[in-house]
Structure formats: C-alpha cells, structure tokens
Amino acid sequence: MTCCEGWTSCNGFSLLVLLLLGVTLNAIPLILNFVDEDQFFENPISCFEWWFPGIIGAGVMAIPATTMSLAARKRACCNNKTGMFLSSLLNAITVIGAAYCLLVSIQALAEGPLICNSQSNTTSSCEFSLKNLTANYKESFDLQWFFEDSCVPHTDSNNPSITNTTANNWRVYNLHFNSIENQHRIIHFSVFLGLLLVGILEILFGLSQIIIGFFGCLCGGVSNGRSQIV
C-alpha cells in the first residue's frame, strides 16, 4: 500500500465514523418526537431536523466516497490513477453534503428550538426553503435562547386570565413548562452542535482526500512504471 492509499484508507474509516455519527445525531430528535407524541410532525423540537442535515448531508452524500476510500485498504480500486481521481470526485460530493449539514446546523443554533420562537409547536410553522439558510445570516449570531433562564416570550401581564391565576398554580405551571422547555433546548443545542462539528470534520477530510487523490494520480503513474521495469 502506497502512502496515498494509506491516507485514503484512514480517511475512509474517519468518514465512516462521522457518517454514522451524523445519522445518529439527526435521528435523536426525530425518535424522541415520535416516542413522546406517538406520531411525527406533532410538537417537534425544531424544524431543522426535518431538513435531514445529518441523514442526507453528512450521511447519504458521504457514502460513495466512504466506500471508495475503504476499498483502498484491499487495493481494490484506489491503486491506480483512475481510482484515485474517482475518489477525489466522490469526495467533492461529500464536501457539498457536509457544507449543507454545516449551514443547517448554524441556522438551527442561531434560531433555537420551536418552543423559543413559535406559539404552535408544529411543522406547519416551518418554511422549508434553501433561501432560509442565508436569509438570517445578517443578524447577530448568539445563543441567548440557550444560556438564558427561559427563552419563551413572556405573556402579557395585562391579560386578565393571567392576573387572576393564583401564585401557587402559576409556580406549578411554570416549573412544568420549564422542564419541557429545558429538555427541548438541551437536545436542540447538543444535536446541532454535534452536527456542526461533524460537518466541519467531513469538509476537512473531504478536502484532504481531494488533494491526496490528485497526488495519488502522480504516485500511481510512478508505481506502475517501476513495476513494469522490474
């Protein structure tokens, strides 16, 4: 195994781990939503897990490059110019998918879960458009929704239905509401921070494989020439 093939094989194992991690992280809020509500699309944690950044972006789009890179271990297809060049092209798809995962994760961390932004916790309030990925980047990026005691907008204190509520009932309701709110905030933050890191690492591994693939084309030519002389 040449140095190029060795690095390609290492890249393949790294992409495989990141691929599985991305799919798992993306599936966590979907599974929890189904377990809690016994059906999808009702009271989701956020809109962004339904963009499937980990399942499609960091997962499906990384499968071809991962398979090709792992084949280098057995010298099945990455031991020649064509194989290394094809590996570079497939990793370009991985970089695109990882960039998609990265953009969705940044947007998700900027906006927070639905419980912090919407009165109706349903996917009916979600706008699935690629324009949304860049629409709010001009705004300041912060994580106040996560670090504050509560991210839920305060209700109007002049509302008679609230002023007539007893203090004891309000405290019980507030504690119960915050427990659900904190659960959504922690899951949302953990999932998309993890997907953000997965996207960054996949981009780095993908770009490194693109570069090493072009070097592999040169190494493959030299290796073939030496084998013919021997």
Curated annotation (Swiss-Prot):
Membrane topology type: Multi-pass membrane protein
Parts of the chain on the Cytoplasmic side: 33-44, 105-185
GO cellular component terms listed in the entry, alphabetical order: endoplasmic reticulum membrane; membrane
Lumenal side: 1-11, 66-83, 207-230
UniProt PTM: Glycosylated at Asn-132 in presence of ceramide which inverts the orientation of TM4SF20 in membranes exposing these residues to the endoplasmic reticulum lumen.
Any GO BP: negative regulation of proteolysis
Residues of the site described as Cleavage: 13-14
Location within or outside the cell: Membrane; Endoplasmic reticulum membrane
Predominant location category: membrane
The organism's place on the tree of life at top rank: Eukaryota
Function summary: Polytopic transmembrane protein. Inhibits regulated intramembrane proteolysis (RIP) of CREB3L1, inhibiting its activation and the induction of collagen synthesis. In response to ceramide, which alters TM4SF20 membrane topology, stimulates RIP activation of CREB3L1. Ceramide reverses the direction through which transmembrane helices are translocated into the endoplasmic reticulum membrane during translation of TM4SF20, this mechanism is called 'regulated alternative translocation' (RAT) and regulates the function of the transmembrane protein.
Homology family: Belongs to the L6 tetraspanin family.
Protein name: Transmembrane 4 L6 family member 20
Source organism of the structure: Bos taurus (Bovine)
Gene: TM4SF20
